[in-house]
């Protein structure tokens, strides 16, 4: 009997448990619709809480001084995961509801409905749990202050991860204060140090400031101090005039109060930190120094006992890098190409620079014959002894692959500049034209188009590097420059063909055995005070003497034996006040740059230079006159910007006589602008114009400035003028235009014009890119609605190509434009100071296409609080882009 009772109790318990399970399981199915509705409601509540928290974070983080708490980020990340699961459930809910039968009490597939219903309940509990956790008193904390400028870096990096971790970990060790990285050129030292710099920008490391300095060969204390001073905000006219000891003291006084990291790229000798003003890093101050160099010996001199060698890539990583550069399409274009590509990779000896350059060169070679030719050419690299001789022929292959001798000559020409020198593209193309690499017979515009095409080819071939911030400059990698000089000298056989001793501190002419063999000579950036002698340079075509700040005198005999000289650059020689009359003997001269010199008059002999095409006289602030310039019958470009000599009626008459003139940059007073209507050739040629009134000559100013709609005008600056209105008129030489139009005007600067109330004339500049308006006390509108209606037959939408708008000290400014504008290209809106009445910006929720790249910079905290946004959507779109400067 007792046994029966025991069995009965056991069965009852199991039946009870089964019935409970059945009840719960049944609820998964029977209550599915209600559970889904509860889940949707709970998810809506959770999303609302998330949006509230995210909004708080955005408002607190946009200044850059705070960062979100880790626990808040975990909560937000978990919501994202939950939301994905919720969307997954929701995507099949209709099918699951239709699977139910018997009024929802059963299912056509009980197992499937049970599993789905259980997922709904489990997710509902998680959502409710997350919702209850989403109550935060604070959502951000003070961000660690680490001033780091993130540097651009190539997209394809292979084989450096382990070395990056090794260097970073070493740098973070308490007992390590200086880290030295050494290795051959082109091996990736700069890339590695750049990654270290950028890692600081992401992780901080507890440092106040990270300073990046490119040192290079023959660097001076002044150059290094200037780079550090710029980062610390010390630069300026007064600071530049101090001696190195005073600058060192200033640097030291700033850095001794900071925990800093100093990154020195490409040092060739010991850098005396004390002389520069940098406190020596130690355990006490917690500061760090890291540097790259070609020499292990330099590491020892810098006090590094265990420097890290950056070696070439191993075979596997080298092959991976070449594959990425060549691309799968090219490698797959013929079954034999991968095998030949491996041979090419082996010939590069693991040098990243060679792999990058040759990989990009071969990326469009898709025939087996081209790859066979590549392996044949690269085989000759083994015929040279020494590392340099193994590298340069490899690099030369990309040079050999350039189409045409003109492109090759243009590339080699870039090696005349110092290491790491940023060369302005426009200046470089003018050099190329005068050298004859580019023909100008069909006009300046076509010649420049060809020049930019060549530059694009050289950049894409990795033979030139385009500026990271300034796209108008290019530079050369050190090893590529060495290769170019090697080619210039006929692979080292005739080194005197090209003398390049730029930026090495010369104070007298170099010793050259055979001056008659010299074709190009670059002595720029040196310490000449006088240039004496009469070298017999009968083959000399190019002579660079610019940036010799101490140069006072050039002897009369110096230019006597240079009959072939076509390019002479004497710019930025600030102590040079006169030129010898013997310059008239440079009968082949086509390019003369005297910009930034202190010359007071042009030598009479200059008038004899009948082949002169380009004359640059910008920033010649003591130059009294250029009368007689009409004798230069071949002149095409005249640059006079910021010169003491301005465009007056007499000069206009002379320039009108120059039949080949195509480009002028000049200053002019507002009262003389109207004279341009009388001199059509001069008007057509003006590309940069600087309109300035002289306080001592008020009779030259006007109340209404009438601008001729100059088609070629690219840049206009109106500074300290007294006019109260600017009007546009069609020019006599463009009468066929319906409306006056500045079709090429891209840059406008207006400063200190207190009488102006609006700039409505900008409606006639449809291709404007940069607009800067400063210190116009009575300016009320950029574009006036009333005036626009009076001058236009139909509405024109302004600023469609505007990229940067800079406004400063405009106390009466109320409006930029009366309606919201699309601003398809706008990247930066600067409201720098004292624009208190500008409350409404021409923005709505659809303005600015790439809002993620857009920034609104402002200097007064109260200003952003007074902004009247179009609506909440507009505020939500643009408030995170605002940055307090």
Curated annotation (Swiss-Prot):
LRR repeats lie at residues 517-538, 539-561, 564-586, 588-610, 611-633, 634-655, 657-679. Changing residue 281 to S: In strain: cv. Ang-0 and cv. Tsu-0. Changing residue 532 to F: In strain: cv. Cvi-0, cv. Kas-0, cv. Landsberg erecta and cv. Mt-0. Changing residue 511 to K: In strain: cv. Cvi-0, cv. Kas-0, cv. Landsberg erecta and cv. Mt-0. Residues 27-61 form a coiled coil. Residues 141-443 form the NB-ARC domain. PANTHER family: NB-ARC DOMAIN-CONTAINING PROTEIN, NB-ARC DOMAIN-CONTAINING PROTEIN-RELATED. Disease resistance (R) protein. This is Disease resistance protein RFL1. It comes from Arabidopsis thaliana. The lineage of its organism: Eukaryota, Viridiplantae, Streptophyta, Embryophyta, Tracheophyta.
